[in-house]
């Protein structure tokens, strides 16, 4: 299990490996690559009651919340001032539609969060070198007002069965930039730097197929 020192003694945050066992129950939703955000108030909330939510937040101590990923980008947030946390599932659609900023704005509305106080973790996800996309995805990003220059690369003609050529996007970096645009200090953002496609310790839908297992990315206030 990959643990993050986001606030030792106050918060536990981690990403599971494929052979990890959860240390306790983690509330997760049925994710649909959307931007709906759920406020969780019961540590025993079952997954079926969270249909269609790709981000969860809570201010309940002892309530572990999380998101399931297998190449998509997990973002975990902690507000040490208002004492609240959030877990975000940000695939290319969620990144395109700014689910991370929307979650921060929701935390501001519900908890009074100041983005400058937030501590963030961007967990393992597919890296730019491995995230090959079609031209239509690039156009979606351009059309949605996102400056793709810092996150885009053209790696030459696309070859059948290879991830090396074609268009590539850096969802990890885009989520970091989106957090900073919201006011989260760069120094407060931890990036794991691990690629789920390259690192066999993690499940990867692109490497193994969509029916593979999922990595659990969780956060809990103590």
PLM feature spans:
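Active-site microenvironment for binding and transforming phosphate-containing groups
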Residues: 1-222
